[in-house]
Amino acid sequence: MKTIAITLPDFFPNEAEAINRLFAEGSIDLLHLRKPDSTIDECRQLLDNIRNEYYKRIVVNDHFALCAEYNLHGVHLNRRNPTPPPCHQGSVSCSCHSLEEVVERKPKMDYVFLSPIFDSISKQGYHSAFDEATLKKASAEGIIDQKVVALGGVTHERMAQLQEYGFGGGAMLGDLWR
């Protein structure tokens, strides 16, 4: 099962060191660099302080030009950036908020996030949208599989439960950075 880290939306002191440590400790497989209000130069400054050996494990949610510039793992589509750049060679992922959306978007993606699976740690009042029976049924029907990554309230302690539901991994934000 993959463990994916999502950065906090704002930069913080020694962030690159924290990211390097997560990779070095084997705590994460991929990192989604998600800084929606950042400039491309601010993201470059962060990337310049991350060890280049980890670049192939970083996905950008904004400033897609950084993917080719730093030879990163891929891009994550969103409302701000709904399509990959021309001639993009890396992975392409997106976020889904319903099982219907997973069915529609998963075939065109390398992987998708499905959220919120549990009550969010980082977003107050953002509650789980799926009960256990729904997740087990979706897994049995092949909707949830190795290409679907759980997001929302994911912790290291919940990874075994996500594996039981058939997810290919879990994405963490709040649990990693608090």
Report the location of each language-model feature.
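Active-site mouth loops of central-metabolism enzymes
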Residues: 1-17, 93-95, 150
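Structural preference for beta-strand elements that scaffold enzyme active sites
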Residues: 2-4, 28-32, 57-59, 73-76, ...
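Glycine-rich beta-to-alpha transition loops that act as phosphate-gripper elements at the mouths
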Residues: 9, 58-64, 94-103, 117, ...
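Alpha/beta enzyme core
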Residues: 17-29, 80, 102-114, 161
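Glycine/Thr-rich beta-alpha phosphate-binding loop at enzyme active sites
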Residues: 70, 78-79, 90-140
